[in-house]
């Protein structure tokens, strides 16, 4: 599959892996690791990405939630041609176009975004949640199911137990036991969220599942090829 570099997401990129890595290093310098989330957030959003047609189509699911009840208010699925093949460490270049399309479908701007993927817990400190945050300017957190970079001590067995993930002596995220007898999640800030804020928001949005509600609902939507989770009562369906 060829790499397609058209559009503002890839402005200035010649399609090479080396330049993509250089762009990641440059964009990582723009990541803000302090809390700029509203003191009284009203809307959260969860995003997840999947692929169809043998990888030729990228599918991004977006769920807008009430920040207080964690009930879904809107669900959307965006599909775009896949821009490049899978390259380890460059997932954001593959997923970002579809995520931006899904974001554009939301009728309201979320106060905080949760993305299924890495934030700064990435070899070059720019996973998909960090890349998305820098491009959109939205506060963003990454929640991944597997470690990509760094090392950590196994957290305790109880829900909420956590240990820092370290890379080169610096903390890049948390290993969070979100559910007993489940592997820990990899939680890291993406943009405009602190290390403690990323952990705190994940704990606040957990229910009885392994994933926090924003990415759990987005994962359901993405994995069911457009089938929507139940929306809050009296909420209009928006497409």
UniProtKB/Swiss-Prot annotation:
The cellular location(s) given in this protein's UniProt record come to: Cytoplasm
The answer to keyword Nucleotide-binding applying to this record is no
Q: Which CDD domains match?
A: Endonuclease_V
> What keywords were assigned to this record?
Cytoplasm, DNA damage, DNA repair, Endonuclease, Hydrolase, Magnesium, Metal-binding, Nuclease
Q: Name one GO molecular function term.
A: magnesium ion binding
Q: Which Gene3D superfamilies match?
A: archaeoglobus fulgidus dsm 4304 superfamily
Q: What InterPro entries has UniProt attached to this entry? A: Endonuclease-V
GO terms for cellular component: cytoplasm
Q: Which reaction does it catalyse?
A: Endonucleolytic cleavage at apurinic or apyrimidinic sites to products with a 5'-phosphate
Site annotation (Interaction with target DNA): which residues?
Answer: 86
Which residues of this UniProt protein bind Mg(2+)? 48, 116
**Pfam families documented for this protein:** Endonuclease_5 (PF04493)
Q: Chief localization class?
A: cytoplasm
- Listed GO biological process terms: DNA repair
**Cofactor field:** Mg(2+)
State its Enzyme Commission number(s): 3.1.21.7
Q: What does this protein do?
A: DNA repair enzyme involved in the repair of deaminated bases. Selectively cleaves double-stranded DNA at the second phosphodiester bond 3' to a deoxyinosine leaving behind the intact lesion on the nicked DNA.
Tell me the protein's name: Endonuclease V
- Name its species: Xanthomonas oryzae pv. oryzae (strain MAFF 311018)
């Amino acid at each position: 599959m060829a790499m397609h570099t058209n559009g503002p997401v890839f402005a200035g990129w010649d399609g090479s892996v080396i330049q993509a890595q250089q762009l990641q290093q440059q964009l990582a310098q723009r990541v803000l690791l302090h809390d700029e989330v509203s003191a009284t957030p009203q809307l959260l959003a969860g995003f997840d990405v999947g692929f169809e047609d043998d990888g030729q189509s990228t599918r991004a699911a977006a769920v807008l939630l009430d920040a207080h009840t964690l009930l879904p208010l809107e669900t959307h699925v965006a599909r775009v041609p896949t821009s490049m093949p899978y390259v380890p460490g460059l997932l954001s270049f593959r997923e970002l176009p579809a995520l931006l399309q899904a974001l554009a479908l939301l009728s309201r701007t979320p106060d905080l975004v949760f993305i299924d993927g890495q934030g700064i817990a990435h070899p070059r400190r720019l996973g998909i949640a960090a890349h998305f945050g820098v491009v959109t300017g939205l506060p963003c957190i990454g929640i991944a199911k597997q470690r990509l970079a760094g090392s950590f001590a196994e957290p305790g067995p109880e829900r909420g137990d956590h240990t820092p993930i370290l890379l080169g002596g610096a903390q890049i995220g948390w290993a969070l036991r979100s559910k007993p007898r489940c592997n820990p999640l990899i939680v890291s800030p993406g943009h405009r969220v602190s290390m403690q804020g990323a952990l705190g928001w994940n704990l606040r949005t957990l229910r009885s599942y392994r994933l926090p509600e924003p990415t759990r609902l987005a994962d359901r939507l993405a994995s069911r090829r457009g089938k929507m989770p139940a929306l809050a009562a009296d909420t209009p369906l928006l497409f």
